[in-house]
């Protein structure tokens, strides 16, 4: 199987732009540090081109076997391309079992087809960090923090629900003492008056304002009949036909002689004409006079 079956052609357009951006993230200084570490761990020289020296997967398999013996049982001689790909695949599976996170691991084509050398470099740095965490003398990468597990009793966990963290803010030593739930009746009163407990629902605290001694005595509910009269005239509550002076005055006029609605009205002037005559049931003309 020839190399032409695995190597891609030149990239154009958006693919070329993405490839150039990935290439710009590649760090030559990190490459030199990786070279020193890998050559020191395996005892083998990589060569002038760093990525070409790792492309067959032989040095990578030897590296993981040094860090964790027996990780790769068989290392293929790089006779054909599929041998190289198999070596790279064995290395990737081995470092995953070693503890490298899956999102830090490159794909085989990233190295074999030279598509993403930056990701290959990141994977080797993650492998160095994992080796340093496990106690190997590696001058590259960072040591991961060890997991610190704590087990608490269920009673302790329930008590923690009553504690408000500082990230929620502070109430400056205030409390909710005396607060009621939503929808509960509120008994308002002024403690300065010496009343320990609220008297009734009509007692309003001073923080609600003051009514200056006024009360709601004599007030009726909406829709109730109102008995209107003028107490300054000495009148008592007689009936609903008496209108108080606050409603205006009719100047002594009365409704005497008024008829109910719908009756006919006989209109005439007694100075100029006699009283109007009406025909009775007997067919005769009868005169009616005003009685004064």
UniProtKB/Swiss-Prot annotation:
PTM sites of type Phosphoserine: 175
UniProt PTM comment: Phosphorylation by PKC or CaM kinase II reduces the binding of calponin to F-actin and tropomyosin.
Species this chain originates from: Gallus gallus (Chicken)
GO CC terms in record: actin cytoskeleton
Domain of life: Eukaryota
Expression by tissue: Smooth muscle, and tissues containing significant amounts of smooth muscle.
Role played: Thin filament-associated protein that is implicated in the regulation and modulation of smooth muscle contraction. It is capable of binding to actin, calmodulin and tropomyosin. The interaction of calponin with actin inhibits the actomyosin Mg-ATPase activity.
InterPro entries: Calponin-like, Calponin/LIMCH1, Calponin_repeat, CH_dom, CH_dom_sf, SM22_calponin
GO BP term, example: actomyosin structure organization
SUPFAM superfamilies, per the entry: Calponin-homology domain, CH-domain
Family membership: Belongs to the calponin family.
Stated name of the protein: Calponin-1
A Pfam family matched in the record: Calponin
Modified residues (Phosphothreonine): 170, 180, 184, 259
Calponin-like repeats: 164-189, 204-229, 243-268
Region: Calmodulin-binding, residue numbers: 185-193
Domain Calponin-homology (CH) intervals: 28-131
GO MF, one example: calmodulin binding
Record's keyword terms, sorted: Actin-binding, Calmodulin-binding, Phosphoprotein, Repeat
Gene of this entry: CNN1
């Amino acid at each position: 199987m020839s190399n032409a079956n695995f190597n891609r052609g030149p990239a154009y357009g958006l693919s070329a732009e993405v490839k150039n951006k990935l290439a710009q993230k590649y760090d030559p200084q990190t490459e030199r540090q990786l070279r020193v570490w890998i050559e020191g761990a395996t005892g083998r020289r990589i060569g002038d081109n760093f990525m070409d020296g790792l492309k067959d997967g032989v040095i990578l398999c030897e590296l993981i076997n040094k860090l964790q013996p027996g990780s790769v049982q068989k290392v293929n001689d790089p006779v054909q391309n599929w041998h190289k790909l198999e070596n790279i695949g064995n290395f990737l599976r081995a470092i995953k079992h070693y503890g490298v996170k899956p999102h830090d691991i490159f794909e085989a084509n990233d190295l074999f087809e030279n598509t993403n050398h930056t990701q290959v470099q990141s994977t080797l740095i993650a492998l160095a960090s994992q080796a340093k965490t496990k106690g190997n003398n590696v001058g590259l990468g960072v040591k991961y923090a060890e997991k610190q597990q704590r087990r608490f009793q269920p009673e302790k966990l329930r008590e923690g629900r009553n504690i408000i963290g500082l990230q929620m803010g502070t109430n400056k030593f205030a409390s909710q003492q005396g607060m009621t739930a939503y929808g509960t009746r509120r008994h308002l009163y002024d403690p300065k008056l010496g009343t320990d407990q609220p008297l009734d629902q009509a007692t309003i605290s001073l923080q609600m304002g003051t009514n200056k001694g006024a009360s709601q005595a004599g007030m009726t509910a909406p829709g109730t009949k109102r008995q209107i009269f003028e107490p300054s005239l000495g009148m008592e509550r007689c009936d609903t036909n008496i209108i108080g002076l606050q409603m205006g005055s009719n100047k002594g006029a009365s409704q005497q002689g008024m008829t109910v609605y719908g009756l006919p009205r006989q209109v005439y002037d007694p100075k100029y004409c006699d009283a109007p005559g009406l025909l009775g049931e007997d067919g005769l003309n009868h005169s009616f006079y005003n009685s004064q």
